[in-house]
């Protein structure tokens, strides 16, 4: 609901910079179900690198954890900003913004996709912009789901431990795959 309130629609970009927390999934699944591209930014990047990613990706909305307030204060990119889990000067409160919104799904749900960035070992971080799913159904299968169920025998009873930062491709994609199958994900901070 928040994404639509800010005019974000199919193929628009939202960016997150968060520590590992269950809210990470609330935001990524919300973006995924809204047909958005969601950029998960490393909390280890400099303000210059983060600004570059926000500008390069075309992010229209940025959500940062209040625990990263030091990094948040140094950003210069002009984008609508929210902080999660506490006050950050210059950022709206995500919790306050969500409170009046309906808890029901949006009417125009469709599948979105992550847009992750490399660590920039040969220069600036590079965004990997994969095509949005052709089938807009939010419950469609994908190659990771088929691999997880076929090779690794994941089921709705599976419990998956993810010890790595969720801004990395493998932890994010595998844990969301477990969710898609109906399993449980345990994340480490």
Question: What is each stretch, according to the model?
Answer:
Residues 70-116, 124, 130-145:
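ANL superfamily adenylate-forming
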Residues 2-48:
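Conserved AMP-binding/adenylate-forming
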Residues 136-159, 163, 167-189:
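Conserved AMP-binding/adenylation subdomain of ANL enzymes
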Residues 35, 121, 182:
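Conserved G/P- and acidic residue-centered "switch" motifs that form tight phosphate/ATP-binding loops
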Residues 14, 31, 62, 118-121, ...:
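Conserved S/T- and glycine-rich ATP-binding loop of Class I adenylate-forming
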Residues 18, 41-42, 65, 79-88:
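Short beta-strand elements of ligand-binding domains
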């Amino acid at each position: 609901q928040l994404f639509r309130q800010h005019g974000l629609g199919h193929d628009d970009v939202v960016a997150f910079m968060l520590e590992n927390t269950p809210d990470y999934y609330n935001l990524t699944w919300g973006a995924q179900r809204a047909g958005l591209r969601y950029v998960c930014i490393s909390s280890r990047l400099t303000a210059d690198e983060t600004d570059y990613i926000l500008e390069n990706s075309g992010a229209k909305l940025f959500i940062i954890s209040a625990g990263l307030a030091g990094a948040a204060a140094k950003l210069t990119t002009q984008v609508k900003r929210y902080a999660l889990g506490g006050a950050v000067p210059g950022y709206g409160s995500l919790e306050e913004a969500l409170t009046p919104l309906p808890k029901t799904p949006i009417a125009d749900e469709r599948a979105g996709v992550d847009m992750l960035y490399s660590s920039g070992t040969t220069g600036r971080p590079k965004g990997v912009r994969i095509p949005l799913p052709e089938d807009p159904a939010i419950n469609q299968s994908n190659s990771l789901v088929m691999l997880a169920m076929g090779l690794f025998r994941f089921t709705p009873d599976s419990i998956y431990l993810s010890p790595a930062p969720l801004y990395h491709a493998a932890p994010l994609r595998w844990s969301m795959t477990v969710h898609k199958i109906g399993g449980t994900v345990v994340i480490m901070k």
